[in-house]
Amino acid sequence: MSNCRTLTLLLGALLAARHAHCSPNCPPGDRALGRCMPTAEERVNIDITPEDLLPENPSTFIQFIHHSYSEMVRVLKKTAAKCSQISKTYSIGRSYEGKDLLVIEFSANPGQHEVLTPEFRYIGNMHGNEVVGRELLIYLAQFLCSEYLLGNSRIQTLINTTRIHLLPSMNPDGYEHAAEMGAGYNGWTNGRQNAQNIDLNRNFPDLTSEAHKLIRMPLARLDHMPIPESYWDGKIAPETKAVMKWMRSIPFVISGSLHGGDLVISYPYDFSRHPLEEKMLSPTPDEKVFQLLAKTYVAAHPMMSDKSTSRCGGNFNSKGGIINGAEWYSFSGGMADFSYLHTNCFELTLELGCEKFPTEDELYSIWQNNKEAMLGLIEMVHRGIKGIVKDEYGNPIKKARISVRGIRHDIITGEDGDYFRLLIPGSHIVSAEAFGYSRVTKKITLPAKMLKAGRVDFVLQRVDVRNRKFPKVIPEDIYERFDPLDRFDPHAQHGGAEPSEGDEVSSRNGEKPWWWSYFSMLGHNRPSWLLKKNENKM
């Protein structure tokens, strides 16, 4: 947006507000926001420039422009500083060319997971030439900060009850390459990949192929599937590793991956259940939940919900603006499938416009079309049920399974024993179980218009494990055995370096891995070849 247009919009806002506050006793905050008419003294000898019209704290002036990497970092850090009581920035790692993958977080207690507070994430710019998501998340960060400080009750409630993470650019290297062509260039490949020429949305472990095989086994669960060891033999982008570690470090409930090139909401599975079928409906066990999430975004987006609109050379009106990913086009190694099958998190792919790199004069209308939809999707983390699983002494039980009858996908409790289970309205049979404990089952009913998660706690009794069969549970070390992600720590600020070859291997809690004791007697002959093998797979 040009300075001239910015100035026009701001002047229009000032004129529109002239009837709102005419009292000479105008509150300072309202005066700074331009909600009050200036006094006679204030109207004398004023040379108006766009900079003069920038509202002061607490408001944030959103410039609807494209942001370079340095500009994006500056805006995010400035926003976090302005709202330091509810916001902070952190890096989850670095891109191949060394740029921080910077996240801005909003919550009542930034930097910490709070029991029974759901976690949400948005990821933008996974493909470097698809820039709409990048800009929308920069705008959203400023909007959340500004509206919170202005006393917007909806935003204050959202931030006080939710932990929100925004990663505007997963592929900053690709963006810089695409930006060289300039806004308006709508090429489909320039800058799409990262600096290693890797498509990040084809670079995640393919767990979907195995899930399609397991579906034929009646007792098999389609959740928290381990990463195949063979995956580490391939070429893995540092951006992919960083996001995978991030996914596992925080108990996200819902995620939205923002893309461009079409106007539709896609949901898992993205990989067809039949390898020879390019367009085959391949639903997850949570098909109805995914449809509910996708329809929520579409309903709040004026263009997606407009049934008279034919979009981007295609038309998804017959499907209500949503589509199963594999039914649209099939591919493996996608982030959304991995998120669903490896973690607790349900991820949507949000295709937000026909143009991948729109011009600046289109950005304001794109923001207006998506603002309400983005907020609405975040609020969906408060649907379904949540609770805490404890033993009879009140101690939380981590890694307990939360099962829903008829849905072959379980949710796992976190370190504090809390869980969040998205469900559609209606009646459900829900169970909690953990190794060494009795199983507890409850019947619940969720009203159609319930706007917050129902509280369903479980108390499990200790039982004698001898001569008793237990259902398959998540092993304590499922993420530790020979898993290179435990050798990769992207959470050090500014992308801390990976451990060097000479560093000793340890598990997440700082102890030696489970197999180390078998070799301790070997002294200097301990199996360094085994360590090197795993390190090389990084």
Label for each model-derived stretch:
Residues 119, 180-393, 410, 419, ...:
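Metallocarboxypeptidase
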Residues 22-100:
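Short glycine- and acidic-rich boundary segments immediately preceding or forming the N-terminal edge
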Residues 3-22:
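Cleavable N-terminal signal peptides of Sec/SRP-targeted secreted and luminal proteins
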Residues 132-180:
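Short helix-loop-beta-strand segments that form the rim/entrance of peptidase-like active sites
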Residues 437-463:
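Structured interaction patches on ligand/partner-binding surfaces of diverse proteins
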Residues 426-436:
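A short, solvent-exposed beta-strand micro-motif common in secreted/extracellular proteins
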Residues 85-87, 99-101, 117-119, 160-165, ...:
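Loop/turn elements at helix/coil->beta-strand transitions in domains of secreted/extracellular proteins
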Residues 401-425:
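Short, acidic Ser/Thr/Gly-rich low-complexity loop/linker segments typical of extracellular
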